[in-house]
Each structure stands twice: as structure tokens, then as C-alpha cells.
């Protein structure tokens, strides 16, 4: 189905940059819906640690890929691409514009440009990597990844074992780094895109990240982690915001150190997000306070 005069407005950027607020504002302006391109917000059980928009923050705007499935179910970028394109087909029947908002770069790329062809996962090799993880720990394995594929090491979530395993797996299968499979070939989409990136001076961003982590802890982040501790080995919980709390629960460090790690790792995650999105030349960057400038830019693009 072709939607040559339909637009996807994409809002990307690092964690705590204000993406959700902008997406809701734009959705209300264009009377449309928001698709969340976030690999963890899709899970019903995870709300505080994923910075999921509350019903109040959603402000009546329909949100998709939020609270969609249980953490016991699997979800990945390929599924997001397939289901997202199907959903856009439906939404474009009544909307000229749809908003996509999120910080998971691979999900955004999959939806807008398609996925790079990669070798299929090898179950035996994956099992071997799991055993190595138990024996060596994640830090040693991320060190190995840095040696064999520094480009991938610079952009993936290093707190996420599945991402690290996959990169090492591809190298061991093929002798080539995962980054070498990224051809840059883009699949044609039947809609146009307007890509907005939010960023600010690093000191300001880091202060926002620290304040938001304080609010998350006040809102019950530790309880959320404890409530889901039976799923701690699931991909979604082996990420920033949860793994640090599990370390505290395990007695590896005290609460003060837990908070320090939560903030430090969130800042590191933001840096990796910026590294990823900065490679997309189509993204037009703004400070989140530049609402008028953002709106003017979008309106001009829609008139082209």
C-alpha cells in the first residue's frame, strides 16, 4: 500500500531529553497517534524503570507498543518492524501524520529503513556464550567485543548481555564484525519521514538524567525491580535501571553505590544513544526547549 503524501515524524535522542513530551505535543497538534520505539516500554510489567509515559502524560493521545505484552513474551526489532509497518498501514487510513518516538536506535532504523541481513543465530554457539557469561562475567565479554568490533562496542547497550552475545556470535560464526554487515542499504518505505533529534549541552543532559533517576527511585523503582526479580535473567531486565538494583539486592554493594551506578550507567547509555543517532544525517537536532523552532521546521517540511 502506498502513502506517498503521508508522513512519519520521528522524535529521537538520549534518555531524559524530553522525547515523550514533544511527541505528545506534536500528536495533539496533528490529531494523531504515537508509536513507541522503545525495546522495554512494550512490556506491561516495566513502567518506572523504562520511563513509560503515565496516562496523565499521554494526555489522551493513543500510544502503541506501550504495555502491549508480558515480559514473559519475546519481542525484537524485526517484530517491531513488521508490526509497526502493519499498524502504519491502518493509521494512515485516517491520519496524514503519525509520530514515532523512542530511544532504541535499532527499532527506529528497522521501522524506517529495514534490517541488515545477518547470519541466523546458532543455538549451540549461543549456549556456549551463556556458559562463558556464567564463568567469565559480562565485563570480560564486553572487553572481548571491544577488541573484535570496536564500532559495535561503541553503540550498543553494554549492560544488555543479549546485544553483546549477538555481536560476539556473529564474529565467531563469520570471522567478520557485526558492524561490517551494516551495508547502509535502505529499504523503500511508502511514506515520507521527518526526523527530529533532541539534545542539549552534556552538563544539562547529565543533570536531567540524575534528577530523573532520583524521581524514579522516589516513585518506587526498587520495588518494581524486586517485584520482577524472578525475570532478572530476561533480556529486558538485564539493562540499565534494573541490573544495578539486582546487584544491590545480591549484596554486592550498598544503596549509595547502587544510586551512583544507576546514574553513571544512565549517562553512559545516553552517550551511546547519541553516538547512534548522530550517524543519521537526516536527523535535525534541536534543544527540547525550542518548541516553536521544531514546529516551524516540521510545518515547512510538510509543505515541501
UniProtKB/Swiss-Prot annotation:
Organism: Cytophaga hutchinsonii (strain ATCC 33406 / DSM 1761 / CIP 103989 / NBRC 15051 / NCIMB 9469 / D465)
Protein's UniProt name: tRNA dimethylallyltransferase
UniProt keywords, alphabetically: ATP-binding, Magnesium, Nucleotide-binding, Transferase, tRNA processing
Family: Belongs to the IPP transferase family.
UniProt cross-references to PANTHER family, sorted A to Z: TRNA DIMETHYLALLYLTRANSFERASE (PTHR11088:SF60)
EC nos: 2.5.1.75
NCBIfam families associated with the record: miaA
Gene Ontology BP annotations: tRNA modification
Binding site for substrate: 15-20
Gene transcribed to yield this protein: miaA
UniProt-annotated binding residues for ATP: 13-20
Annotated region (Interaction with substrate tRNA), positions in chain: 38-41
Subunit structure: Monomer.
